[in-house]
């Protein structure tokens, strides 16, 4: 949201905080170092709708809600259901994808409901590589999407015990298996084991689950509405490696395992909430005062289990070494919070709301945040809204404690845990919470019966932003890795390290525009028009400096923050409905983005200070979907995402690693997979 990191968005399910993923993004770009919520673990068949609050909300919800809040509402019907299936592939002929889902509602007793959902997804890999300079052939499978198998379940249930008490519960469970190809390794590397060369594959076997139990009701102590709940969520990926080798062991013995257990990760979150609300009639206010307050207790845990010994021995498994005992461990913290929210109408046109929240973290202390919001209705057609809020985001436990080393044929790059001896050797300091101030001003217009407009201007200032920075190369990097108990494979010519740091102060400002309009065509049906536009710019206000006096962010990392996302995005959609037919057409324009790319050839090859500036030109994407109601219950569909097979600009030769890496994966506005064509069917009952 609003050009910020996934870490700056709070995700709720049915109004309850969702746990974060145990996977940390280490691939570079704006998302580098992020550990946000994985929405893919919530089955699509279970979702009724998604609510988006594009405003700072830390004063109501606590950490993470700097850019806004996403609230996923699960289906709660007590009867009927839906069965859906779709099948498609990319225009290049690969990436066969199948999705299937079923949802149904049951009623029990006089007031109880149970809504059940199941979903599966099967996705074949894609390959978008150019010519490998080492072999002269196309098809290095490391450039493409991985193969994926996912199964997911969900339920949502509730029952009223009497007029004032309702019990409720909901849960999700997802199992996901992924196999991701890495860079092809030449036959000369291990001719006995792999006479034709080999392609290592990172595997992930992941279980993600969440359970909420709660009770809510009214008339507590005569007047209070109340909600008492407990939510436990966990993400547990097991990471392995197939078709690989430990080169050091192979050199010593002539043999090596080909598969390795690299690590097991776990991120858990246990949240307990008490929320209370009531209205007070006060003589000096023209309308009741809505008084809400609540308490929250949260326990967070992050765990890293070491891989098998050969996965990290003397350089470890090729492509990605396993976690060694020195980088494994378990870390946890406790969070206590309390909030107060007051709202009222000062007259029939003017609404006012104020909120404050206090939170105490066992690992870094306390924070207090506030919000003031107002809405004024000038007429039935024109309203204005404004808000001012402070916010914060605590560093995730993974950001503080995760270590990894990625290895390609000529490069090794390590992310060091910020509180590790290795990072301390380079001058790392403890992470502090990010702090923010948000300003929002908007207009809501209904100038015509079928026309709705909303325009919102915003400004978000973030201090001590947590970024992936502080890059070191050469001998300092090698010394730091060794100090952290990480061995480096022999024969590598370029070694670098980096760590998470409070490295930047930023200012983001922009404009959101949404519009909807209904065109009535009489006997020819209707067209629902939707327009969405965003203009957004992030400025680096301050580049923090390390102990050595050098800036923590180089030009490449600065570009990730300020230029890796489009500064404007406009989407126009028309949805035509005519008798049994429906046609949806959507056109989206993304403005250019800018990257500072690594050089892989020439005098600046592998430099961490000099980069190759590259512009991804503006892109226009066309999506189309056709549907037909074959019967009262059965709907057939066909469509294309990216109908005209638009792909990102290709990289210049000097920044295309070994020739096969064709695209800028850090700042491309669109996927490199191109057009996707599909057929589908849905049956309601």
What annotation goes with each model-predicted range?
Residues 150, 206-208, 326-335, 381, ...:
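Outer-membrane beta-barrel signature, preferentially recognizing the C-terminal barrel domain
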Residues 537, 587-601, 627-685:
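C-terminal beta-signal and adjacent terminal beta-strands/loops
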Residues 198-212, 219-221, 232, 242-352, ...:
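Outer-membrane beta-barrel transmembrane domain signature of Gram-negative proteins
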Residues 12, 38-40, 52, 64-86, ...:
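N-terminal periplasmic accessory domains that precede
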Residues 22, 234-238, 243, 299-316, ...:
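Surface-exposed extracellular loop regions of Gram-negative outer-membrane beta-barrel proteins
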Residues 79-82, 92-182, 187-196, 200-218, ...:
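Transmembrane beta-barrel wall of Gram-negative outer-membrane proteins
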Residues 16-54:
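Short acidic/polar hinge/loop motifs at secondary-structure boundaries
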Residues 452, 457-463, 467-599:
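Gram-negative outer-membrane beta-barrel transporters
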